[in-house]
Amino acid sequence: MARIAGVEIPRNKRVDVALTYIYGIGKARAKEALEKTGINPATRVKDLTEAEVVRLREYVENTWKLEGELRAEVAANIKRLMDIGCYRGLRHRRGLPVRGQRTRTNARTRKGPRKTVAGKKKAPRK
C-alpha cells in the first residue's frame, strides 16, 4: 500500500478513487493532482512505480492542508465563531442547523434523536 499524507490508500483501486480516501481530497482535487504529476487516473495504486508515488506524495502534501492539520483548522474556525458569539457560533453551540434550514420539522441529524414531551392528559368525560 502507498502511504500519502499519513493514510494508507487502498492498493486495488484506481488512483483517482484511492486519493479520495484522504481527508481533504475529493474527486476534483484528486484529478488535479494526477494531472499536475502526469499520472494516468485509470492506473491502479498497486501498478504505480515508487517514483510516481513519491511525486504524488510530494505534490499532495505540499499543496494542500490535509488530514489532522485540516481537521484542526476546521475545529478552530468553529471555535472562533462560538467565541465571538455570532449567530453561526450560537447555532453550533446549540447543536442546531447553521445555514438557515428549518427546525420546526426535520433537522434530526443535527438535533439528534427526538426528546418526546408528554402531552396534556384529557379529562375523563362524565
Swiss-Prot record:
GO CC term, one of those recorded: cytosol
Transmembrane feature ranges: none
Region (Disordered): 95-126
Gene3D superfamilies: 1.10.8.50, 30s ribosomal protein s13, domain 2 (4.10.910.10)
Pfam families per UniProt: Ribosomal_S13
PROSITE patterns cross-referenced by the UniProt entry: RIBOSOMAL_S13_1, RIBOSOMAL_S13_2
UniProt keyword terms in alphabetical order: Ribonucleoprotein, Ribosomal protein, RNA-binding, rRNA-binding, tRNA-binding
Any single GO BP term: translation
MF term (GO), any: tRNA binding
Subunit structure of this chain's protein: Part of the 30S ribosomal subunit. Forms a loose heterodimer with protein S19. Forms two bridges to the 50S subunit in the 70S ribosome, contacting protein L5 and the 23S rRNA; these bridges are straddled by the 5S rRNA.
Family statement drawn from the similarity comment of this UniProt entry: Belongs to the universal ribosomal protein uS13 family.
Cross-referenced NCBIfam families: uS13_bact
Physiological role: Located at the top of the head of the 30S subunit, it contacts several helices of the 16S rRNA. In the 70S ribosome structure it contacts the 23S rRNA (bridge B1a) and protein L5 of the 50S subunit (bridge B1b), connecting the top of the two subunits; these bridges are in contact with the A site and P site tRNAs respectively and are implicated in movement during ribosome translocation. Separately contacts the tRNAs in the A and P sites.
Protein name as catalogued: Small ribosomal subunit protein uS13
Organism (species): Thermus thermophilus (strain ATCC 27634 / DSM 579 / HB8)
Name of the gene encoding the protein in the UniProt record: rpsM
